[in-house]
From Swiss-Prot:
Source organism per UniProt: Erythrobacter litoralis (strain HTCC2594)
Gene Ontology CC annotation, any one: cytoplasm
Top-level taxon in the UniProt lineage: Bacteria
Annotated localization: Cytoplasm
Enzyme Commission code: 5.6.1.7
Protein name: Chaperonin GroEL 2
Length: 550
């Protein structure tokens, strides 16, 4: 086991604080509309240029072990905020630094760290309550666009594209961000339910120009197992022919004579039919087939439920307005399912999302939810170079998370003013003792830091700007760093999602509280690798001298 180096008290805290400052100072230059870029060297390829706080934080690794501990703890603040809210990482870092610095000063002055932490927790709870009480619901796509614009550092095109995507697929829909080959932003949307399975045979194609199968007003047979026996299918095929409507078969697989018969019938024109494999695998396949059944008002034909294929009637089949199938995807548009049944299924999936602990399962459940409740939109980000595309993609990701957070918990005035005005609820608030009251004061000072930093990055004196704002009665009034003016920020469209501000403060206070209450730090002593193992260094053997006589 490697030897350890242990530092106590002030020595430990000094190294940690230095690391916190190093990381925070690199991240906070990106805050606000006039924040600067950070250039990150890559081990191969061009350097990366970004204005995304969490990207900067993740790249920082310090040489000194104790400084690195502080930097990594503060990096955790940025990462956690990014995971929970998707934005606000720079704000969280600025808040974390402010709380740690003030807290360390108080500990150095002889105050009890545990009471300081209790005071910090009391203050954070009060501020969060205040933020929630002042939060406003997002009304319309204009406000959604504004949230996106602010989060994308003033890029109007990004905000508008996200608002357009949300309008098309709904608030529950899936919106993904991809890189585009061209220079432009593009938005692609898929209406209805789409799953990644194409036609089983090209002979099913009805539109040779597009190489797609297009079925208008079809019946949909949803079968859980493989279909290879033709006899069992005959009754339902005959019923479909008599109805004169197309038939889509979704099953685990269709093979042998069953597939051959379907193809022959299609080519002869007796039956408009197409077949696709069921999406997903294992239990997830069952769940997705059930989703399709509910969406199309059909029944999933399963031996487990005691339903045999030969006994299936037209009334047990699903229906939809249109189905389009290409070689990779199947899209069901406007299924005949009952609104109430779909809603119940959506709520069931939501409960599963809340209860699952696996990120992978959560992602798959969210995809299912979107397919049932909304749709899927893809925002394709373009640019003149690979570096530019990556930088813009970072901003679009941030903006997308921010708009989702705004829809979830509402909005507050932006530019750090929501936290600035929350200082008023902490005035006169006392803890059980002086040290707890000092903890409350630490938070009161810290939550002014984001406004100051935004003003500083815009070339103004942060202390003067925050002082001017605290004299205001209108809590929507703030400093718009983009235009260098004092104005009503809600009317000007400078708004932040409440969830982002709340999560940033809670995460910053949580990690800062741990650092303030740290009394010892342990790091590994690097092994001395100057000389290898085995024989000791012989320092050279010298010359052998003349041998003479020969």
């Amino acid at each position: 086991m490697a030897a350890k180096d242990v530092k106590f008290g002030r020595d430990a805290r000094e190294g940690i604080l230095k690391g916190v400052d190093t990381l925070a100072n690199a991240v906070k230059v990106t805050l606000g509309p006039k924040g600067r870029n950070v250039v990150i060297e890559k081990s191969f390829g061009a350097p990366r240029i970004t204005k995304d706080g969490v990207t900067v934080a993740k790249e920082i690794e310090l040489k000194d072990k104790y400084e690195n501990m502080g930097a990594q703890m503060l990096r955790e603040v940025a990462s956690k905020t990014n995971d929970l809210a998707g934005d606000g990482t720079t704000t969280a870092t600025v808040l974390g630094q402010a709380i740690v610095r003030e807290g360390m000063k108080s500990v150095a002055a002889g105050m009890n760290p545990m009471d300081l932490k209790r005071g910090i927790d009391i203050a954070v709870t009060k501020v969060v309550e205040n933020l929630k009480s002042r939060s406003k619901d997002v009304a319309g796509s204009e406000e959604i666009a504004q949230v996106g614009i602010i989060s994308a550092n003033g890029d109007r095109e990004v905000g508008e594209k996200i608002a357009e995507a949300m309008e098309k697929v709904g608030k529950e829909g899936v919106i993904t961000v991809d890189e585009s080959k061209g220079l432009e932003f593009e938005l692609e949307t898929v209406e209805g339910m789409q799953f990644d399975r194409g036609y089983l045979s090209p002979y099913f194609i009805t539109n040779p120009d597009k190489m797609t199968v297009e079925l208008e007003n079809p019946y949909i047979l949803i079968h859980e197992k493989k279909l290879s026996n033709l006899q069992a299918m005959l009754p339902i095929l005959e019923a479909a022919v008599q109805s004169g409507r197309p038939l889509l078969i979704i099953a685990e697989d269709i093979e042998g004579e069953a597939l051959a018969t379907l193809v022959v019938n299609k080519l002869r024109g007796g039956l408009k039919v197409a077949a696709v494999k069921a999406p997903g695998f294992g239990d997830r396949r069952k769940a997705m087939l059930q989703d399709i059944a509910i969406l199309t008002k059909g029944e999933m034909i399963s031996e487990d439920l005691g339903i045999k294929l030969e006994n299936v009637t037209l009334g047990m089949l699903g229906e939809a307005k249109r189905v389009t199938i290409d070689k990779d995807n199947t899209t069901i548009v406007d299924g005949a399912g009952d609104e109430a049944d779909i809603k119940a299924r959506v709520n069931e999936i939501r409960t599963q999302i809340d209860n699952t602990t696996s990120d992978y399962d959560r992602e798959k459940l969210q995809e299912r939810l979107a397919k049932l409740a909304g749709g899927v939109a893809v925002i394709k980000v373009g640019g003149a170079s690979e570096v530019e595309v990556k930088e813009r993609k970072d901003r679009v990701d941030d903006a997308l998370h921010a708009t989702r957070a705004a829809v979830e918990e509402g909005i507050v005035p932006g530019g750090g003013t929501a936290l600035l005005y929350a200082t008023k609820v902490l005035e006169g608030l006392k803890g059980e003792n002086d040290d707890q009251t000092r903890g409350i004061d630490i938070v009161r000072k810290a939550i002014v830091a984001p406004v100051r930093q935004i003003a500083t990055n815009a070339g103004h004196d942060g202390a003067v700007i925050s002082g001017n704002l605290l004299r205001e009665d209108n809590e929507s009034q703030g400093f718009n760093a983009a235009t260098d003016t004092y104005e009503d920020l809600v009317k000007a469209g400078v708004i932040d999602p409440t969830k982002v501000v709340r999560v940033a403060l809670q995460d910053a206070a949580s990690v800062a509280g741990l650092l303030i209450t740290t009394e010892a730090a342990i790091s590994e002593v690097p092994e001395d690798k100057s000389s290898g193992g085995g024989m000791p260094d012989m320092g050279g053997m010298g010359g052998m001298g003349g041998m003479g006589g020969f």
